[in-house]
Design a protein with these regions (language model features):
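N-terminal intrinsically disordered/low-complexity leader segments
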Residues: 1-13, 24
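C-terminal peripheral helix-coil segments that are non-catalytic and often amphipathic
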Residues: 1-3, 133, 137-144, 173-194
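Helix-turn-helix
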Residues: 14-17, 21, 25-59, 63
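Short, hydrophobic secondary-structure boundary micro-motifs
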Residues: 35, 109-113, 121, 151, ...
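Hydrophobic alpha-helical connector segments
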Residues: 63, 77-108, 156-160
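Short, basic, alpha-helical segments at the C-terminal edge of helix-turn-helix-like DNA-binding modules
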Residues: 66-73
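Amphipathic alpha-helical packing segments from all-alpha helical-bundle domains
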Residues: 101, 110, 120-147, 154-158, ...
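Amphipathic alpha-helical segments used for helix-helix packing
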Residues: 101-120, 169-173
C-alpha cells in the first residue's frame, strides 16, 4: 500500500491499514523509517489518527513485533502439520518455514528478536509464546522419539532457534547464497538428529 492506495481505507480497519503500511515501510527503510506522522501521510489520514491505535512509535513497533510473531508461529505450525509423521521431515519443514519468513521479512524478524520489554509495554506477545511453544513441542517430540539427543529441551529449543536465525541472517545479509538454503537446512536437521 502506498500514498495512492489510501482509498482502500474504510472506517473500522485503520489499524490493519497502518500495520500493513508500517510493514511495507519497515521492509523498504528499516525501523528508523517508521513514524506515526509518516504513516498518517502514507495512508491519507490525519496526523493524529494513528495515535488512536498506537500511543507512540514504540507501541507501533510492539504491534509489528506481535504481528510478526503470530504470522511466523502460524507458518511454522502449518508447515509442521502439513508433513507426515516422520520427525526429520517435520523438523525440516519447520526450519524451512522459519528461514522463508526471514528471507521475505528480514527487517521484521530483526525487529521481533531485537525487541526488548520494559515496564511500559507488554512482555512476550502471544504469537511469540505460540512460536516458542511449537518449537519446544517439536524438540520434546524428537527427544521422545529418540531422534534428538536427551537433555534439557529448553536448551535444545534455544539452540535450534539460534541456528535458524543464524542461517537466516547469513542468507539475508548475502554472506550465504540463497541457493545454499536447502543444503544448510538439510545439514541443520542432520546435525540436530541422530
Amino acid at each position: 500500500m502506498g500514498v495512492t492506495d489510501h482509498r482502500a481505507y474504510h472506517h473500522g480497519n485503520l489499524r490493519a491499514v497502518l500495520l500493513a503500511e508500517a510493514e511495507r515501510t519497515l521492509r523498504e527503510h528499516g525501523p528508523d523509517g517508521l513514524s506515526l506522522r509518516e504513516l498518517a501521510r502514507l495512508t491519507g489520514v490525519s496526523h493524529g489518527a494513528p495515535r488512536r491505535h498506537f500511543a507512540d512509535r514504540q507501541a507501533l513497533l510492539d504491534a509489528l513485533t506481535a504481528t510478526g510473531f503470530a504470522r511466523l508461529a502460524d507458518e511454522m505450525c502449518a508447515a509442521i502439520e502439513e508433513t507426515g509423521p516422520d520427525y526429520r521431515t517435520r523438523l525440516r519443514a519447520a526450519a524451512a518455514a522459519f528461514v522463508r519468513f526471514a528471507v521475505h521479512d528480514g527487517a521484521l524478524l530483526d525487529l521481533m528478536f531485537a525487541s526488548k520489554t520494559d515496564g511500559h509495554h507488554s512482555a512476550l506477545p502471544e504469537g511469540a509464546v505460540r512460536l516458542f511453544s511449537a518449537v519446544g513441542d517439536l524438540v520434546r517430540q524428537g527427544q521422545q522419539a529418540q531422534v534428538l539427543p536427551p537433555g534439557d529441551p529448553e536448551r535444545l529449543r534455544l539452540l535450534l532457534i539460534a541456528t535458524l536465525q543464524g542461517i537466516a541472517a547469513l542468507i539475508t545479509s548475502g554472506r550465504a547464497h540463497a541457493e545454499q538454503t536447502d543444503d544448510l537446512l538439510d545439514d541443520t536437521v542432520e546435525l540436530f538428529t541422530r
